[in-house]
Regions:
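N-terminal secretory signal peptides and thylakoid transit peptides that target proteins
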Residues: 1-18
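Short, glycine-/small- and polar/acidic-enriched structural segments
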Residues: 28-154, 160-162, 178-184, 199, ...
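Solvent-exposed, polar/charged alpha-helical surfaces in well-ordered, non-transmembrane soluble domains
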Residues: 71, 75, 89, 125, ...
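Sec/Tat-exported extracytoplasmic proteins
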Residues: 77, 82, 92, 131, ...
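Pocket-lining segment of extracytoplasmic ligand-binding domains
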Residues: 86, 167-255
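Secondary-structure end/capping motifs
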Residues: 221-302
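Conserved C-terminal helix/tail region of periplasmic/extracytoplasmic solute-binding proteins
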Residues: 293-323
Length: 323
């Protein structure tokens, strides 16, 4: 089985690697591919889908966010990993040596604005003058800005309260914020615990695109580049398995992350779209550019930023053929 490394171990560069059994394909044979994973996700999914028989050595490093994955890539500690559209904007602004190589179709119904069950807030326009929690420099800040803009408001019209997810939950439960822009399993867990209401989801405000990125230097190595392409295809096939075995995956993932199975299964069934891996398109580049432009307006990154050079389309034909 693949070794799973901590972020600290990876950035220190001091970890051993385990070669996996060779598969039929020889893509990237003789090299080690270092892949980022989120808790309980990529390694377990690939294993369940029978996709871990890589012809190259494979190691996983566990990370809590895409921004940290970019940091690890820029430090030369990770070769490939996934993230939202937000980290590539900061990568472009900082000159980080990463490339966006594939587009992930993923759920946005799990990104919402919550309000307490008895709150008088009934529509996004009612957020004016209210204390609204969000996670700074993440999708929550982006879709909150877009939700406000759609009703003629901006961050200047609310009291924005940047909080970590854990601090946001505490503030929400204690009534210290009037609304909370949040994502992931914090949503159904908070709803189950307090009866909180979903004021609005990010569907229509987020593109539903996420990014698979690769270390620029890894792409310059023919064997590593081939291994990355093979890995992307395995991820794509694993997601197809997930859609066909949603209940099995709910059990596996629930056990791995310590979230009740019914909550995991409910979120999977409520997804805005099934997971898939697609080629980079002009529309996908434009979507990340829109994020960059919004974050420039919010003062989070200096402008101007052109995100187009961040994208590498070399795997487009490979991913399109496997559709």
């Amino acid at each position: 089985m693949p070794i799973i490394l901590s972020r600290r171990s990876l950035l220190a560069g001091g970890a051993g690697l385990l070669a996996l059994a060779p598969g039929l394909s020889q893509a990237g044979s003789g090299v080690t591919l270092r892949a980022a994973k989120y808790k309980g996700r990529e390694d377990n999914l690939l294993r369940a889908a029978g996709q871990l028989d890589t012809p190259y050595a494979l190691s996983f490093g566990e990370f809590a966010s895409g921004n940290v994955i970019v940091e690890a890539m820029n430090a030369g500690a990770i070769d490939v990993g996934s993230m939202s559209e937000i980290p590539p904007v900061f990568a472009a602004a900082s000159g980080a040596r990463i490339k966006a190589v594939a587009i992930i179709a993923d759920d946005v119904n799990n990104q919402v604005v919550l309000v307490p069950k008895d709150s008088p807030i009934r529509a996004p326009a009612d957020l004016a003058g209210k204390r609204v929690g969000y996670v700074r420099a993440t999708t929550t800040q982006y879709y909150l800005a877009r939700i406000l803009k759609a009703v003629g408001l901006s961050f200047a019209d609310i009291t924005g309260v940047p909080l970590t997810p854990a601090d946001g939950r505490a503030a929400f439960d204690q009534g210290a914020i009037d609304a909370w822009a949040i994502y992931g399993y914090s949503v159904p867990i908070t709803i189950a615990a307090s009866g909180a209401r979903v004021l609005v989801t990010a569907n229509g405000y987020l593109s539903g695109n996420y990014i698979y990125a690769a270390r620029a230097e890894a792409l310059e190595d023919p064997k590593l580049s081939a291994a990355i392409g093979d890995y992307l295809l395995r991820i794509k096939r694993a997601w197809a398995w997930q859609q066909a075995h949603i209940e099995d995956w709910a059990t596996i993932f629930s056990d791995a992350i310590g979230v009740p199975r019914d909550i995991v299964l409910g979120q999977l069934r409520n997804a805005s779209q099934p997971n898939d891996l697609k080629p980079v398109t002009d529309d996908a580049v434009a979507s990340v550019q829109a994020v960059a432009d919004t974050f420039i307006e919010l003062g989070l990154v200096p402008g101007p930023i052109d995100v187009a050079p961040l994208f590498d389309r070399r795997y487009g034909e490979l991913l399109a053929k496997s559709a």
